[in-house]
Amino acid sequence: MPLLSIIEQNAADIRNVVNDDSLILEHHSDVVNETDNDDAADNKKLLTDFWTAPIIITTLVQMLNTFYSHKMSSVCRFSSLVNSVIVFDEVQTVPYKMLSLFNFAISFLATYCNTTIILCSATQPYLEEVHYPLLCEADDLIVLPEEVKGKFKRVEIINESSMDISGVVNFANDIIDQNYNLLIVCNTKNEAAEIYNKIDNAEAKYYLSSAMCTNHRKAIVAKIKNDLDNNVKVVCVSTQVIEAGVNVSFERVIRLQAGLDSIIQTAGRCNRHGECDIGYTYIIKLNGEKLTMLPDIENGKNATSSLLVETRYNDKYKDLMSPESIKRYYTKLYKNSHGADQDYYISNLGKNMVQLLANDPENEYLLNISAKTAGQNFHVINDDTVQVVVPYKEGAKIIGKFLSNTYFDLHQTLDLVKRAKGYIVSCYPNQIEKLMKDKSVTILETTGIYLLTNLSYYNEELGLLNEPDNTAIMF
């Protein structure tokens, strides 16, 4: 599974069905071994190193590491994939630069390891058209008859005109004035924060983004659900964090233009529970939007733009949620960029992973595969962010205890690290640099843990701020 929010939701459902925790192993970054028993800790490590439990719930990160990472703990898990059934949920979220590597992995498993692969998605990517396509046959498990499809239609996607931020806010206010609850999903945190701050006629409004720690987001989602259940006319302005794994339903949705897969995922939060005959999701192209640092979103947005132009003269693609439109979108997405972009380019080596792992055809009698170099340079998620403990709710107490643990009590530190898991925000280098310059972050010499000690950089509405709120205080 790609997202921790999806894992949390699905893991709970699986446990309820299986009703035997001994059969299930969760292996992802949010799972912490709560026991101080050394034997239990060793058993946990053994399980995660070898994936010996009958049911493994893990992330795409761990799965791809099993194939391509140089770490022995990752390689050891590979044998567990043989003769297994592997379900990839939300497969459309596989990063664009890893499509070829993903195809190699599942093709090998299906062809040589007697492994059954199930790819789940509302917007199934056409992996047969990737630079290095699937080498195994892929069949649809579920095909809806034409006469049945209409019965499942809960939402209509409407392409609106291009607007600036003020136009989006005015459009949103018009919807609010019609007494609908509303979800607005943006491509960046700054866009979401600006729109949130400018909406002023909502009965209740909320903001969601990765600028908030996990526990903060969970608390906001709980408030949103409660308000929706009580017929409060809610407005939520969010980034992509709400697109999957969040079970909420709004009467109207605005999605700033992005990839069609993201648009359809967002539309899944519209009339989700069938509260009305039909819900409406509006696509708005934001004028002057800068997505240079978010190439996957930018590429998807460009492919969607091209498809939307085509809908004007080709009725075949009028319904953006149809299989024909989804296939057309992916065809444009894959062909709009160089095929090698899907092969995991490593800039410091001037080569991609496919080149490193391919045998040199010029040396017929020499196996010339750079497996170690490839593994050392393989990272599913770009590891240029820093995890910072933030002072949200109990996070403030945890930071205080970290600071008072001056003599480095190991057991206390381990306990604090476990408790801090839900109070962490990922910061990019430029954010950390600013916080360090303002002396708002403390780095613990004993552990290297970053603590946000200036309360003015974190608030209950927006999470981690770009600029300090001077009404708050320092630790």
Predicted features, each with a name:
Residues 1-18, 29-31, 126:
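Conserved Walker A/P-loop ATP-binding site and its immediately adjacent core
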Residues 2, 90-130:
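Conserved helicase ATPase motor motifs in RecA-like P-loop NTPase domains
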Residues 20-68:
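Inter-Walker segment of RecA-like/P-loop motor cores
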Residues 25-40, 187-190, 205-221, 237-243:
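Conserved helicase motor
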Residues 110, 170-179, 185, 190-200, ...:
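C-terminal helicase lobe and adjacent C-terminal extensions/tails of nucleic-acid helicase motors
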Residues 116, 122-176:
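Interdomain hinge/linker at the junction between the two RecA-like core domains of SF2 helicases
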